[in-house]
Design a protein with these regions (language model features):
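Extracytoplasmic metal-acquisition and chelation regions
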Residues: 5, 9-172
Length: 172
């Protein structure tokens, strides 16, 4: 799964939301260069795959998406237009947060009368702090896989984050 990067190059990460952008920054420190596709005030369901965003995807080493079809209205177009084989589904540089989690609210049946329903389950996983811990663990592992020479760095930052996060959860 390792991607060849120059020795001092930071991993270029495109995160679909500011939540995941912040988490990648926390886990990757100075080894990552993070760009977030959306602002906290944007509806992540509806984003335009503008040329500037396509250019970011074209040069990315890793894309971090929520998954569970949250970004289905724009992410597939962005990935296709980027022409970047490193960040296509199934590639090491494509990571869906929900792949590390158990989704809730999975409907047993979906039809048009139900309106806009998340057929794969509730993708708004960042609302549960326990999901952040699980996402951080999986994401630090993925960073270590992509940038193997710095694997220990990502593992240490992941462990440090877990300790701080568990302390914060105990206070909540």
């Amino acid at each position: 799964l390792s991607v060849a990067l120059p020795a001092n190059a930071a991993i270029k990460v495109l995160a679909t939301t500011s939540d995941w952008g912040s988490l990648v920054t926390e886990l990757g420190g100075d080894k990552v260069n993070v760009y977030t596709a959306t602002s906290p005030l944007q509806d992540v369901h509806r984003v335009d795959a503008k040329p500037s965003l396509v250019a970011r995807a074209r040069s990315a080493d890793l894309i971090v998406a929520t998954g569970a079809e949250l970004e289905s209205g724009w992410l597939p177009v962005l990935l296709q237009e980027s022409g970047n084989s490193k960040i296509q589904p199934g590639a090491p540089g494509y990571f869906e947060i929900t792949s590390a989690l158990r989704l809730l609210d999975i409907p047993t049946a979906v039809d048009r009368s139900m309106g806009d329903v998340h057929a794969l389950g509730n993708p708004h996983v960042q609302l549960d702090p326990r999901n952040i811990a699980a996402a951080a663990k999986a994401l630090s592992t993925r960073l270590a896989q992509i940038d193997a020479p710095n694997a220990a760095y990502y593992q240490q930052r992941g462990a440090d984050f877990q300790a701080r996060w568990q302390q914060a959860m105990a206070r909540w």
